[in-house]
Swiss-Prot record:
Origin superkingdom: Eukaryota
Organism: Drosophila melanogaster
The protein's role, per its UniProt record: RNA-binding protein that suppresses transcription of some RNAs. Together with Wdr82, part of a transcription termination checkpoint that promotes transcription termination of RNAs and their subsequent degradation by the nuclear exosome. Promotes transcription termination of aberrant RNAs, transcripts from genes containing a transposon inserted at their very 5' end or RNAs from heat-shock-inducible repetitive element. Binds RNA preferentially at a sequence that resembles a cryptic 5'-splice site.
Disulfides per UniProt: none
Acidic residues biased stretches: 9-30, 644-668
Quaternary state and interactors: Interacts with Wdr82.
Compositional bias ranges of the Low complexity kind: 790-800, 1042-1056
GO cellular component: nucleoplasm; nucleus; polytene chromosome
Protein's name according to its UniProt entry: Protein suppressor of sable
Length: 1325
């Protein structure tokens, strides 16, 4: 055993590498065979040199390798460190011997194993322990030693080995099971592995699968028998001769040159290093997939990792375009739904189609909404396989995958895909290799159905011809060989088994597959259909369609109106188009159509095969079966012959018409020579106009109204359209005309002159006549034509034979006396029709009027025409504009084709929403007595007005809910409950009292006789109850209400909660309270909490106990008095909250009239103020006096008297002043705490005219009465009896509090707590 050591430190690969692992992760550069001895270089600690061991013989069992750091370049055995002296496990020895054998075999072949380089000393590189021979390695450097502890490294490796052994044992059973089904079940195994994201490299260049062995040997020795060139260009990219065709990114990276007989275990370990643990566990299964690839011929090319999108040639064929001849399709020709959601974890390794799946929109000829960002393939023409994949996807994919794409039928998709395919082939100069769409793309089931349909069509045509010949012979025998008359035809119904197919999906496919221009109901003589003219392309309808609508239609593959015909109405609406949009498209498109287009364009209308329903002889029952489709040929309308909605004309809807009585029609036969029978069934020539479809109803109406009206003005009565009216007589086969004798004395005289006059009538007049006949098929008397679902939608003037009154002139009942006006083109017919001649086809039914009444109704309709334009239709017609692409059920005729719709016009009107806030704001500025409507007061949240009709016109004693009328402005944010104040509202008249009633001045106290004693119940006069209330409820509650209103001393069961709620509601609607700052509101609530507590205690006392509410705490608390003054309330000795009405006269403001603006009581023009009396606990004999509200003492205007009153002692029975904790305030007596100079004007804000108010303006503590401007609240009067001034916490002292740091106003001194800069919110109002 020859061993050579390098100069660099040696790594003990026994410790760093696991059992026979080969690490080739970082083999970015292929080692050349010239590098047999590595150069002596000093690198970092991570750059290492490896010891290669070569066996002298091929006996692998004798080779036991010890690898470690060495200091001697000659003797390897002496250089082994202590860490490697222990015998290696058997697995390591076996792996090393196998690698040695591989290296020796390669050397004998002339191939030098490459020398892989290591990234670091900590990474496992078991491959490189066997690379190179002993003579190919340089001597080791004795100075550099491995720094890692061998014991620690050994323990770590042992733990890793144990873990890997456990995992291998768990996976060994799986590998054994997979080995059993390698050959027969290779495809299934491969699918499973691809689902696990397991991907391997390309097969070796041998191309043949090696024999499988239990030891996991991958390749035989013969696989490596190649020269340098073949190895370099092999599919595996193995660089022979050390030249390096191999790199770490090779598609066959799981193998190296020297592992010809290497077990699969090594590859599993390498895969663990390269990928993840899951791929490592599936290493053996990857070998099976590579073997199968080798059997299939393998991949050739650059040797990169095999991609599932690789083509058959060129290795990296993932970029090859779609549809290539060498394209290898994925096994799963289905779209990956996870890729669609952008969450496929397998990515390129997924077995389903990702990016290569063809885009539905692109290959159907639509505009892909995603554009360049589309997830699917755009580009070259599809192969037939991918075409079928896309067709299957559109048919079977669930709604979740299709998304917004509207599912279309297979046949429509084939047509669109073929058109797109031809365009792509032309653009790219490719050959169109697709099979015929009509035959090759149809399945066996479709082919069978097509054959059956063709056979049925031929059978029907033969039967039709026979029946026509019979009818012609019979007509010739009955009519003496004359030309058959219009009403002489006998028509057999079509075969019952030939009902129309599904109107939504399969009908167009059957027609396209048949290769005929018409449907299965069309004559064989009909030529191929012509597409719509190019001016009806959607690209030319930009004035009709918006960009959004155009995108919607392009999304469905619709580029012109012909394609829109093929799309069902429901699908158009699902695509986002509204009924208005669809109708507007068609209406404007037909308006834009040239007038001569209808005359020049001609195609064959599909004629109905009609048979007699009951009896071939119409003489027996007087009934005939008439084809109605020919009627519409007179309307100058030309349409495509391949109408996709022809199945709507295929129904067995034959109109049974009573032909009057049995008589001959010889006199009608001569006029018929000059005019074609409109109702006759023809094998029409190509010059006749085709039939309109349901889709083209508006064109019929527009031509009748627009083009027809111009034609009526330009053409004489005898002028007709020769291309459409008379061409079918010389061009058609006269033997196909069917006729039956019809008796005709008086019945046919008028009818013949109407229908077949000596001169041909104007086409529009005739079309109007036909339209009215067609309108109601259930009215058998109403005409001689059947009704199709696509033949009636006109608004022109007509002679209706049905009594269906509508506002429209074109849908009105007959007006016989107006015939001369309606039909100026019929000079022969008009005299023949007396004004009162009834219709000869009248047959009584439940829908019809009496003929006499019908005549009278026609006369009345002339007078009421304009009025009826705004009324609803009377015979259940649609009340809207006709929908242009409407497909109603044709089993009945109760739709727009038998009931002409009314034209409605929608006018958009903007109505301002009701703003109750503005109403409330406007109510604030009105005289509040004007708003007496209780409904408006409830809407605005105002209390209902009390009954002010007491004796002497005085204000009665108000109960707890007796809010003043003048308090409307303070109740603007809540809606009053109807049962909240029952005591007063039940006694309030429902109608508003006269507005002239004026409340008395508060300066006049109410008479004492109105005040009852405390414990004496006073009966109130009976008043009217609110009529809006339930009378039964009023009766039940009357005794209770009377008792509760009479007994004012009854205790409140809720314990004063009603009084508390009243005070709170007054707070919420008070502008003064709402404009206060947060701190001031807290202070007000704290003061009112004292009142609430006393009210609760008082009202919880027994009812029979004599009780008088103690108001002494209110009298002694000036802050409470000021709060009550601001709220205009006081609490009487019964514990009830009474509101003080404001002063109604205008010479001065009411109580605190200037209070909201910072002024004091008596603001404005110096109005009087109010000083509350001292309502401390009185002696018992004064209890009755204390029930009175506080007297309203009007203040004198003389400033001297005001000064005198302001400087006197305690006024009106107030207790003497008491000092607070800090003593008496500096500039005032006990009452004027914190009040500044009282003598000057302008001290109280806006109270300029009246002078100062005594007592320091006790009712406006928040108004700023210390020399500040209006709205200043710099110094609040003392709170309670503490004698402590209250500073404004929100605004700065002086200067209105608008700016920080304002100069001291009066005694404010600017010492406020909240010196908030820029506080422009003036809360002192």
């Amino acid at each position: 055993m020859s061993v050579a050591l390098a100069d660099e430190p040696l790594i003990d690969l026994e410790e760093d590498l696991e059992d026979g692992e080969i690490d080739d992760d970082e083999e970015d550069e292929q080692q050349s065979s010239k590098i047999q001895v590595q150069k002596k270089t000093f690198v970092g600690d991570d750059d290492v040199q490896f010891v290669g061991v070569e066996a002298k013989n091929q006996n692998d069992d004798e080779d036991v390798v010890y690898v470690g750091p060495s200091t001697d370049a000659v003797c390897l055995q002496n250089s082994n460190s202590t860490k490697s002296k222990k015998p290696r496990p058997l697995e390591d020895d076996h792996a090393s011997s196998i690698e040695l054998a591989i290296a020796n075999a390669l050397k004998k072949k002339g191939i030098e194993p490459p020398m892989p380089r290591m990234r670091s000393s900590n990474q496992d590189t078991s491959d490189q322990s066997l690379e190179g021979s002993g003579e190919g390695l340089a001597t080791a450097n004795p100075l550099l030693q491995s720094t890692r502890s061998s014991r620690r490294r050994k323990r770590k490796k042992e733990r890793e080995r144990e873990q890997k052994k456990d995992k291998e044992q768990q996976n060994r059973s799986r590998r054994d099971e997979n080995d059993v089904s390698v050959v027969p079940g290779g495809v299934e195994d491969m699918d499973e592995y691809e689902m696990m994201n397991v991907r391997g490299g390309s097969p070796p260049p041998g191309g043949a699968a090696p024999p499988l062995s239990s030891c996991g040997q991958r390749f035989s020795g013969a696989d490596w028998d190649m020269d340098d060139g073949s190895a370099a260009t092999g599919a595996a990219g193995l660089g022979a001769g050390g030249g390096g065709g191999y790199n770490s990114h090779s598609s066959y990276d799981s193998y190296s040159d020297e592992e010809t007989n290497g077990p699969g275990l090594m590859n599993q370990r390498r895969r663990t290093r390269r990928d993840n643990e899951k791929e490592h566990q599936r290493g053996v299964n990857n070998r099976k997939r590579r073997d199968r690839d080798r059997l299939e011929g393998g991949l050739a090319g650059s040797g990169s990792k095999r991609n599932r999108r690789d083509s058959g040639e060129g290795g990296g064929g993932g970029q090859e375009k779609m549809g290539g001849s060498n394209r290898v399709e994925p096994r799963k020709l289905e779209l990956c739904k996870f890729y669609l959601m952008d969450c496929c974890a397998k990515r390129d390794k997924c077995s389903y189609m990702h990016k290569e799946f063809p885009c539905k929109y692109y290959y159907l000829g639509m505009d892909c909404y995603a554009g360049d960002d589309c997830l699917f393939y755009h580009g070259e023409p599809l192969s037939e396989q991918l075409r079928n994949v896309l067709l299957k996807h559109m048919e079977t994919a669930p709604k979740e995958i299709l998304g917004d794409f509207k599912r279309i039928s297979r046949d429509i998709a084939i047509v669109q895909m073929t058109r797109r395919h031809e365009q792509l082939c032309d653009q790219l100069n490719r050959e169109n290799t697709w099979n015929s769409i009509g035959c090759g793309l149809m399945g066996k089931r479709q082919d069978h159905q097509m054959q059956q349909q063709q056979q049925q069509l031929q059978h029907q045509q033969l039967q039709q011809q026979q029946e026509q010949q019979q009818t012609q012979q019979q007509a010739a025998a009955d009519g003496g060989g004359c030309i058959p008359s219009l009403l002489d035809m006998v028509i057999n119904p079509p075969l019952s088994e030939n009902k129309r197919k599904s109107r939504w999906t399969e009908k167009m496919g059957a027609k396209a597959a048949a290769g005929a221009a018409g449907s299965s109901e069309r004559d064989s003589t009909s030529p191929d259909a012509k597409p719509l003219p190019p001016h009806l392309d959607l690209a030319n309808l930009s004035h009709v369609l918006s960009a959004e609508n155009m995108a919607k239609l392009n999304k469905l593959g619709i580029t012109n109106l012909e394609q829109m015909l093929q799309v069902p109405f429901g699908q158009l609406t699902e695509a986002g188009l509204t009924l208005v949009e669809i109708g507007e498209i068609q209406r404007k498109a037909e308006d834009a159509k040239p007038q001569t287009q209808a005359e020049l364009e001609s195609s064959t209308p599909p004629s109905k095969r009609e048979t007699e329903a009951n009896n071939s002889n119409s003489k027996s029952n007087g009934l005939i079966m008439v084809d109605y489709t020919q009627y519409l040929k007179d309307a100058h309308v030309s349409f495509s012959g391949n109408d996709p909605l022809d199945d709507d004309r295929d129904d067995d809807e034959q109109l049974i018409i009573d032909d009057g009585n049995d008589s001959t029609a010889e006199e009608d036969q001569q006029p018929k020579k000059a005019k074609a029978p409109p109702a006759a069934t023809h094998e029409s020539s190509t010059e006749e106009a085709p039939l309109p479809s349901v889709f083209d109803l508006p064109s019929f109406m527009n031509n009748m109204l627009g083009q027809g009206s111009s034609a009526r003005q330009l053409l004489p009565a005898s002028a007709t359209s020769p291309n459409q009216e008379n061409a079918h007589l010389p061009g058609g086969d006269q033997s196909t005309h069917k006729s039956a004798p019809i008796g005709g004395g008086t019945s046919t005289n008028v009818l013949g002159r109407i229908l077949f006059g000596d001169k041909q009538s104007d086409p529009e007049a005739r079309a109007a006549f036909y339209r009215d006949i067609i309108r109601n098929p259930f009215k058998a008397h109403s005409g001689d034509g059947d009704v199709d679902s696509s033949n009636e939608n006109s608004n022109s003037n007509s002679h209706s034979l049905t009594p269906t009154p509508t506002p429209e002139p074109g849908s009105q009942s007959p007006k016989p006396e107006d015939h001369d006006q309606d039909m100026p083109e019929l000079p022969v017919i008009a005299p023949a029709l007396p004004p009162t001649t009834p219709s000869l086809y009248v047959r009584r039914s439940m829908y019809d009027f009496d003929p006499v009444k019908e005549q009278e109704h026609g006369r009345q309709e002339l007078l009421t025409e304009e009025k009826e334009q705004y009324q609803r239709d009377t015979d259940m017609r649609l009340p809207f504009e006709p929908m242009k692409h409407y497909m109603p059920a044709t089993e009945i005729d109760a739709a727009i084709f038998s009931h002409t719709p009314i034209r409605w016009q929608l006018h958009e009107v903007t109505i301002e929403e009701s703003s109750y806030a503005q109403i409330r704001a406007s109510a604030l500025h009105k005289e509040q007595r004007e708003l007496r409507d209780p409904r408006m007061r409830r809407i605005l949240g105002l209390p209902e007005t009390p009954d002010n009709s007491g004796p002497l016109g005085s204000v009665p004693i108000m109960g707890p809910s007796s809010f003043s009328v003048d308090n409307i402005a303070r109740c603007a944010t809540t809606i009053a409950s109807p049962d909240l104040e029952t005591a007063v509202r039940d006694s309030t008249p429902s109608s508003p009292p006269p507005s002239v009633v004026n409340l008395p001045s508060m300066s006049v106290p109410p008479p004492s006789m109105r005040v009852p004693p405390p414990n004496i119940q006073v009966e109130k006069p009976t008043v009217r109850t609110d009529p809006r209330r339930d009378p039964r409820r009023a009766v039940l509650q009357a005794p209770t209400k009377g008792a509760s209103t009479a007994n004012t001393t009854a205790p409140n069961a809720s314990g004063g909660s009603k009084q508390i709620s009243e005070i709170r509601s007054l707070l919420q609607v008070s502008n003064w309270y709402n404009n206060l700052g947060t701190n001031n509101k807290i202070m007000v609530n704290q003061q009112l909490a004292l009142v609430f507590t006393e009210l609760k205690k008082f009202h919880q006392l027994p009812n029979d106990a004599p009780k008088i509410f103690d108001v002494s705490f209110i009298v002694n608390n000036t802050t409470l008095q000021q709060i009550f003054a601001k709220l205009f309330i006081f609490v009487d000795d019964n514990g009830e909250v009474v509101q003080i009405p404001e002063e109604p006269n205008g010479n001065g403001a009411a109580l605190g009239g200037g209070g909201d603006s910072g002024g004091g009581v008596g603001g404005g023009g110096g109005g009087g103020g109010v000083v509350l009396p001292n309502l401390s606990q009185p002696p018992p004999n004064l209890s009755q006096m204390l029930r009175l509200p506080p007297p309203n003492i009007r203040m004198l205007r003389m400033s001297g008297m005001m000064m005198q009153m302001g400087n006197v002692g305690p006024p009106f029975n107030q207790p003497p002043p008491r000092g607070g904790l800090m003593g008496m305030p500096p500039n005032g007596n006990g009452l004027n705490q914190g009040v500044g100079n009282l003598g000057g004007l302008g001290q109280l804000g806006i109270n300029q005219g009246g002078g100062p108010v005594p007592n320091g303006n006790p009712f406006n503590p928040f108004g700023g009465n210390n020399g500040g401007g209006a709205g200043v609240m710099n110094n609040m009067n003392s709170m309670g009896n503490m004698g402590m001034g209250f500073n404004n916490f929100n605004n700065n002292g002086g200067r209105g509090g608008h700016f920080p740091g304002g100069g001291s106003g009066g005694n404010g001194n600017g010492n406020n707590r909240n010196q908030r800069g820029g506080n422009h919110r003036n809360r002192n109002i």
